Amino acid sequence: HTAYRRQRQMCIRDRDMEYKSLLETTQNTRDLGGYETCYGRKTKSFSVLRSDRQGYASDRDKKFLVNHDITTVIDMRTEEDVKKKPSSLTNVKGMTYYNFPVYEGSKVPNSVEEVPFSFLKIAEEPNMKAIFECIANAPQGVIFNCSAGKDRSGVVSAILLLFAGAKDEDIIENYVVTKYYIKQRPVSYTHLR
């Protein structure tokens, strides 16, 4: 109940706050660093970034990622989505791109009742093992994405933060604020639609 109350207060308080993606051409690129853990430390900044798709990454975005030692790109979109809207990070020097499709969560659930089961199905997807092995074995920083950076990226973020020992309310908050990020389309992105 405490986590829910805090989440509700945060949503009311921050409803009109501006949420800014780390990349100028995405809506929802965020750092999983800086979260306090039960081990008395904080999660490492710029070690893992969550994002929506990087279909139109600008030179500035690419430089930002390279300068922050992001060397591994994990795209969880389906092959069909990748074919329609390819990632612009596939050929960036110093980065390795992986496509590990996660099919659950690629479409909107049929009902509100299905949402919690969808999260469980995402976590049970066959490619989840490959995703976490890739993150664990990455030589430096990782950015992972799905289409909106919401459900599939949200589940991976929640699992990573849980393993790192982050507080439950911080994990929930990390997921909930996504709706504020995806409301605000970056100005530099709108002309590319």
Name each model-derived stretch.
Residues 1-14, 191:
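Single conserved hydrophobic/aromatic residue that forms the stacking wall/gate
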Residues 152:
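Conserved SAM/SAH-binding loop-helix junction
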Residues 15-143, 155-193:
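Cys-dependent protein tyrosine phosphatase-like superfamily
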Residues 149:
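Substrate/cofactor-recognition hotspot
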Residues 146:
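Short cysteine clusters
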